[in-house]
Amino acid sequence: MWRLLARASAPLLRVPLSDSWALLPASAGVKTLLPVPSFEDVSIPEKPKLRFIERAPLVPKVRREPKNLSDIRGPSTEATEFTEGNFAILALGGGYLHWGHFEMMRLTINRSMDPKNMFAIWRVPAPFKPITRKSVGHRMGGGKGAIDHYVTPVKAGRLVVEMGGRCEFEEVQGFLDQVAHKLPFAAKAVSRGTLEKMRKDQEERERNNQNPWTFERIATANMLGIRKVLSPYDLTHKGKYWGKFYMPKRV
């Protein structure tokens, strides 16, 4: 039997070497397989999919507010750590989430995930900040316009959506990156390990920095009178945040 198999596979193993034909040496390799992860401590909730988000808050009357762009400036102080899951979408900049963004995230993730082995939860509240707008061709004046829609402010460093379950990061990274690419601010898919590695790398860059002319030193010493063009936010955040934008390469 083995002789017949060798005759059948011999033409398939022949490759041209110079002007002659030769057989490739057949050898058996030893594979080192990684251990299969066990998800014994993972529990799937009763409703694993993302819930529907209301377009407007359910309150009797909403007061019109000024722009207040400080709600998307600087680093986030809430929803920066994992709670139940192991994977999430991390915001790398500030911005506003409209109701359409919530629907895009909900439909894409719910259609791509396996509800028997995965679950997803929101880490941002429903739209609550009113945005006013006047009609096209309307004359100036007449007070503030009527409320047009509602948004959710998001700061840099906040987790937008969190996922978990009996799965690995490679299984969810594809559609999480697809969702992150469509958000109105810079974002990326991360896991617990990658998020911790990002923070350690940033700390190591600051600790091993060889350039003595850092932003903090220049601003603190008021070199060339730079204080007159800096804001208090620049002194607090050491120049790493420029409005809603986050600059991780600045040390």
UniProtKB/Swiss-Prot annotation:
Transit peptide residues according to the UniProt entry: 1-29
Keyword Ribonucleoprotein: yes
Keyword Oxidoreductase recorded: no
A single cellular component GO annotation: mitochondrion
GO MF term set: rRNA binding; structural constituent of ribosome
InterPro entries: Ribosomal_uL16 (IPR047873), Ribosomal_uL16_bact-type (IPR000114), Ribosomal_uL16_dom (IPR016180), Ribosomal_uL16_sf (IPR036920)
Keywords: Mitochondrion, Ribonucleoprotein, Ribosomal protein, Transit peptide
GO BP, one annotated term: mitochondrial translation
Localization per record: Mitochondrion
Record's subunit section: Component of the mitochondrial large ribosomal subunit (mt-LSU). Mature mammalian 55S mitochondrial ribosomes consist of a small (28S) and a large (39S) subunit. The 28S small subunit contains a 12S ribosomal RNA (12S mt-rRNA) and 30 different proteins. The 39S large subunit contains a 16S rRNA (16S mt-rRNA), a copy of mitochondrial valine transfer RNA (mt-tRNA(Val)), which plays an integral structural role, and 52 different proteins.
Family under the similarity heading: Belongs to the universal ribosomal protein uL16 family.
Alphabetical list of PANTHER family matching this protein: 50S/60S RIBOSOMAL PROTEIN L16, LARGE RIBOSOMAL SUBUNIT PROTEIN UL16M
Protein name: Large ribosomal subunit protein uL16m
Organism: Homo sapiens (Human)
